[in-house]
């Protein structure tokens, strides 16, 4: 049976476990054109704008 040759250091163990402790990035941000919540880095589904440029023609 395989046995570790050296004891893993605290730094290595904690670095490996730290992936589960990362903070969640907010998935939504306010649209700069209409103020509606929109998914980050995507066109707003309400107005069709992204970064102050219109990308979709929405017939409202």
Swiss-Prot record:
<comment type="similarity">
    <text>Belongs to the bacterial ribosomal protein bL32 family.</text>
</comment>
<dbReference type="InterPro" id="IPR011332">
    <property type="entry name" value="Ribosomal_zn-bd"/>
</dbReference>
<dbReference type="GO" id="GO:0003735">
    <property type="term" value="F:structural constituent of ribosome"/>
</dbReference>
<dbReference type="Pfam" id="PF01783">
    <property type="entry name" value="Ribosomal_L32p"/>
</dbReference>
<dbReference type="InterPro" id="IPR002677">
    <property type="entry name" value="Ribosomal_bL32"/>
</dbReference>
<dbReference type="InterPro" id="IPR044957">
    <property type="entry name" value="Ribosomal_bL32_bact"/>
</dbReference>
<keyword id="KW-0687">Ribonucleoprotein</keyword>
<dbReference type="GO" id="GO:0015934">
    <property type="term" value="C:large ribosomal subunit"/>
</dbReference>
<dbReference type="GO" id="GO:0006412">
    <property type="term" value="P:translation"/>
</dbReference>
<protein>
    <recommendedName>
        <fullName>Large ribosomal subunit protein bL32</fullName>
    </recommendedName>
</protein>
<keyword id="KW-0689">Ribosomal protein</keyword>
């Amino acid at each position: 049976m395989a046995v570790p040759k050296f004891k893993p250091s605290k730094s290595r163990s904690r670095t490996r476990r730290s992936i589960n402790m990362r903070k969640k990035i907010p998935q939504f941000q306010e649209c700069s054109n209409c103020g509606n919540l929109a998914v980050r880095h995507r066109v707003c589904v309400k107005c069709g704008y992204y970064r102050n440029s219109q990308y979709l023609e929405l017939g409202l």
